[in-house]
């Protein structure tokens, strides 16, 4: 058995999705919710997406920790604050409520953020991106999956097939770009089904959709449940994707201290997640009903998502590139991304640490095992080391995670595509990347997970 490094894993970042198609709904009301009350009591309304777990530091986890309420209580301005947390399935209704003046602060994915900007400008109710929750610099938060027994093995195989996605979401953007690179027309080359994630997942299981392109946490959830397998790793695009926090401009101007209190609380929640990744995963799982193993895949110490409130230039640049995809789909017109981004509040909230955090990059993903009954995971030098441990402790393993050999995207070890190359055992999220590696390395071959375990033991 190869050497095992047994030490608690801790995300190596500085301590401090979801999106769906947006229907341009009519304005239903006016007046900010943060202006409610009798003069001494103010209600702040926060819209979030509990199951879009890339936003937990501005939603599910933040709410459970109570940090925002504590920050508001520490303002000492003689005002009694109440927080109204409103949970939504996608970013679209959050945007609708923000432009109606009913939500003050919201969180959503990159493509819905752009629609949030466009909708706010259209209605004269501008909003601004004020912080980031979680991101992946290569695009690994979005994945295209097929049914477990599907014979589809590449993007080219999707020609003429029914593909479910949520139009206007980051997952839709991944689908469009991936198909374009593969030489498949994203409009006429497939039959696109515009569906909410849960509906698309059901369609995939029922056989009425041949593939599903979705955002965190749906691909990982379906793979974990044995209801899907990965066809395309969004990180193959090598384009950043992220989720962020948006605030109404009038709210930010009227109550800047409240917005800064929220961003300070978000930074605290980020620090908690970094320092207690397993506990955070368990907490989010309890609140959402998602398996903790799936939450950890995305939000864990070496998860697919890196959490950091700073608004990094690379993410802003990616947002600018996303505009063309939305315009081509006739979901928006031109969007002034520079005008939409307003990082002054998060700069004040983070203080001197902001500049250092802004340039920080995530560490490479690592192989991890989550032992049953453990409150910490263990990290391994190589995927082969992890396999050797799993082979000897299979009954004691809650979950095992390995990074894709080419993209770094973390995936479940028993759901990965494995390649044997000499003494090396290499995991891949999708079959196409595994085949590409085999084609470029003489003697390398695809093996089953069972064979990989045997080779490692």
For each feature predicted by the language model, list its residue ranges.
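A bilobed periplasmic-binding-protein/Venus flytrap-type ligand-binding module shared by bacterial periplasmic
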Residues: 141-151, 241-257, 419-421
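Short, glycine-/small- and polar/acidic-enriched structural segments
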Residues: 37-186, 191-195, 210, 239
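Secondary-structure end/capping motifs
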Residues: 53, 255-333
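Conserved C-terminal helix/tail region of periplasmic/extracytoplasmic solute-binding proteins
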Residues: 327-363
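Bacterial signal peptide processing site
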Residues: 31-34
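Pocket-lining segment of extracytoplasmic ligand-binding domains
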Residues: 192, 198-286, 384, 391-400, ...
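A ligand-binding cleft/hinge motif common to bilobed small-molecule-binding domains
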Residues: 110-122, 176, 209-228, 318, ...
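C-terminal motif of bacterial Sec signal peptides marking the signal peptidase cleavage site
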Residues: 25-29
């Amino acid at each position: 058995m190869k050497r095992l490094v047994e030490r608690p894993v801790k995300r190596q970042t500085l301590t401090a999705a979801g999106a769906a198609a947006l229907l341009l709904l009519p304005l239903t009301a006016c007046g900010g919710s943060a202006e409610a009350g009798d003069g001494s009591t103010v209600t702040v309304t926060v819209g979030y997406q509990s199951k879009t777990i890339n936003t937990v530091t501005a939603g599910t986890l933040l709410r459970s920790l109570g940090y925002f309420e504590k920050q508001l209580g520490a303002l000492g301005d003689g005002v009694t604050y109440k927080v109204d947390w409103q949970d939504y399935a996608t970013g679209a209704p959050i945007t609708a409520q923000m432009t109606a003046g009913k939500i003050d602060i919201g969180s959503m994915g990159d493509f819905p953020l752009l629609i949030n900007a466009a909708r706010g400008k259209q209605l004269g109710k501008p909003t601004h991106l004020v912080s980031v929750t979680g991101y992946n610099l290569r695009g690994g938060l979005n994945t295209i999956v097929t049914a477990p027994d599907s014979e589809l093995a590449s993007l080219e195989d999707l020609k003429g097939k029914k593909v479910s996605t949520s139009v206007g979401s980051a997952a839709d953007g991944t689908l469009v770009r991936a198909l374009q690179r593969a030489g498949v027309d994203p409009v006429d080359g497939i039959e696109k089904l515009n569906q909410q994630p849960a509906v698309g997942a059901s369609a995939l299981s029922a056989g009425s959709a041949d593939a599903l392109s979705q955002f965190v946490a749906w691909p990982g959830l379906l793979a974990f449940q044995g209801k899907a397998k990965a066809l395309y790793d969004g990180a193959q695009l090598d384009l950043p994707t992220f989720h962020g926090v948006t605030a109404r401009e009038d709210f930010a101007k009227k109550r800047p201290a409240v917005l800064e209190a929220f961003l300070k609380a978000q930074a605290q929640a980020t620090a908690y997640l970094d320092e207690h990744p397993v506990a955070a995963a368990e907490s989010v799982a309890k609140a959402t009903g998602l398996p903790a193993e799936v939450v950890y895949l995305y939000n864990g110490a070496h998860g697919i998502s890196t959490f950091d409130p700073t608004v990094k230039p690379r993410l802003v640049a990616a947002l600018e590139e996303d505009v063309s995809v939305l315009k081509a789909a006739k979901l928006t017109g031109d969007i002034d991304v520079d005008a939409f981004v307003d990082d002054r509040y998060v700069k004040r909230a983070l203080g001197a640490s902001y500049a250092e955090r802004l340039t920080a990059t995530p560490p490479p993903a690592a192989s991890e095992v989550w032992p049953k009954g453990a409150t910490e995971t263990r990290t391994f030098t190589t995927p082969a080391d992890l396999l050797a441990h799993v082979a000897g402790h299979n009954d004691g393993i809650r979950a095992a995670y390995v990074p894709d050999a080419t993209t770094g995207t973390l995936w479940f070890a028993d759901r990965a595509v494995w390649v044997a190359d000499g003494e090396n055992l290499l995991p891949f999220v999708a079959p196409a990347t595994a085949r590409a590696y085999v084609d470029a390395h003489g003697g390398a071959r695809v093996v089953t997970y069972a064979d990989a375990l045997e080779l490692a033991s």
